[in-house]
Design a protein with these regions (language model features):
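N-terminal loops that bind phosphate or other acidic moieties
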Residues: 2-133, 137-380
Length: 380
């Protein structure tokens, strides 16, 4: 009996990792009916991460009333894994762009609901929180999340307030003395796949602000306010966070979770591999089948395919990447431990056209892959 580990990322804009896992499983079992299949849909911290972790690890989804990014009450959620002490939270579930319903306001959106979800998960028994950054509507260092967890933000008169992106310039002092004691002893791991600093031309405001509705003047104000926040953090908390890799993720939420929650930032794929116990699954495996929508030079920077290849390389287990688009620089993946790259593109067409047949093209590529596997197996 052969053993296959299926660990695809989503094909952005076409198929989720859950869908791809299912298609891989169906194709594999058609050609290798007695195969042992380990399906692990990959989460990257953005939308769909809770469902992916629950599918891989078991557990259940918990619905929680919380504050949305525009301060209206919404129904948020998190996933409590089967171990009973690990919770997965998507920042986007309480502070995501879609929740703004087209009314983008980078200077006025809040992450308060994210803090409420963290508290709810801890009260539910979680001692380890996996927080996914991605799809955020906010741009102010996650101060609202911290405020929901008891961190106090004070203006020049000593009055407490909950900052947003447009009011960070009023901030004079940060008081951590009332931070919720429920956080004590809780490990918070933040999934972060970008290395942007907090401020400057590569910072949160300049790179991500426009997609949240910020025009050039607003980008300048937001960047100035985030720099001010970093100075107050340095003054009151003794932390230098402005230039840390990932500080600018999700509108500066990366900086906020490090400064206010003591969280560590970790590449999303490393979080997934550690949580599912990937290294322990490898012994006896025939191959690992992974994939993503596009493989290029950016894929070498800790993305899903390369993260898996690095782990599997130690055991010399083949890693096959099924991808939508093979771009220049993809061949460097072979030096990182990828055994083969299989493209689903059967004809040269623009992405807008290719996405319409993405499912059929993936199925065709998988059909060829497993036919080839059976041919080699029969020839031995």
């Amino acid at each position: 009996m052969s053993k296959w580990i299926l660990m695809p990322d989503s094909f952005k804009g076409t198929m989720s990792s859950l869908e791809i896992c299912q298609l891989m499983r169906e194709a594999l079992l058609r050609h290798v009916p007695d195969a042992e299949v380990v399906s692990i849909p990959v989460a990257d911290g953005g939308e769909g991460s809770v469902e992916a972790f629950l599918a891989a690890m078991g557990g259940h989804r918990v619905e929680v009333p919380c504050t949305g990014p525009d301060f209206r009450k919404i129904s948020g959620f998190y996933g409590l894994l089967a171990d009973g002490y690990t919770a997965v939270i998507e920042m986007a579930a309480a502070a995501g762009l879609p929740l703004m319903e087209g009314r983008l306001c980078a200077e006025g959106a809040t992450t308060y609901g994210v803090g409420e979800l963290i508290l709810a998960a801890i009260r539910d028994g979680a001692r380890r929180i996996i927080l996914g950054l991605g799809g955020s509507a906010t741009n102010y260092g996650g101060c609202g999340c911290a405020a929901a967890l008891g961190v106090r933000f004070l203006d020049g008169t000593g009055a407490e307030y909950v900052p947003v992106g447009g009011t960070l310039d009023r901030l004079c002092r940060i008081d951590m003395s009332h931070r919720s004691p429920l956080l004590n002893g809780v490990e918070i791991v933040t999934m972060c796949d970008v290395d942007n600093p907090l401020c400057g031309p590569n910072g949160a405001s300049a790179v991500f602000g426009p997609q949240k509705g910020a025009d050039p003047d607003m980008v300048t104000r937001l960047d100035r306010n985030l720099r001010h926040l970093s100075e107050v953090i340095r003054q009151d908390l003794g932390r230098e966070i402005a230039d840390l890799p990932g500080a600018g993720a999700a509108g500066g939420m990366g900086a906020g979770v490090m400064a206010f929650l003591g969280s560590r930032l970790q590449m999303g794929i490393e979080t997934v591999l550690d949580t599912v116990g990937f290294d322990a699954l490898l012994p006896g495996a025939t191959a690992v089948l992974t994939g993503e929508g596009r493989i290029d030079c950016q894929s070498l920077r800790g993305k899903v395919v390369i993260g898996i290849a690095h782990r599997a390389r130690q055991t010399r287990i083949p890693v096959v990447a099924v991808v939508g688009d093979v771009a220049p620089g993809a061949e460097d993946a072979y030096q990182e431990g990828v055994t083969a790259i299989v493209s689903t593109n059967r004809r040269a067409v623009p992405w807008e056209v290719a996405r319409q047949s993405a499912r059929a093209d993936l199925c065709a590529a998988l059909e060829d892959l497993f036919r080839l596997y059976n041919a080699f197996r029969s020839a031995r």
